[in-house]
């Protein structure tokens, strides 16, 4: 059995990988945009003597060129909708209870980018 945190991470990684290029860490210089970078994962355990119940918050980061505003918005929307449809992982039943999206302008060297942040919270049963 793996932790609920890793279980959600694996499920989110699979969903993102089906919709775009996904990385677990900063991709190499020269990587094509847009891409997805899985960020932090937060585990909030509920006290229980006989089972593991938890909420897991997964942060997903999206990067695109400054000419790809529509692309990043659509990619974030597609990932969010696909995650909302998830009802179970390899070891747990899950339910998305909350999501939050933000799109920011960002400068990386001489490149102007869009940086999207999608935070999703799952209840793990």
Question: Predicted regions: what is each one?
Answer:
Residues 55-63:
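A short small-residue
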Residues 62-66, 122-124:
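Short beta-strand-to-loop capping motifs
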Residues 1-14, 43-55, 92-125:
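Short, charged interaction patches at domain edges and termini
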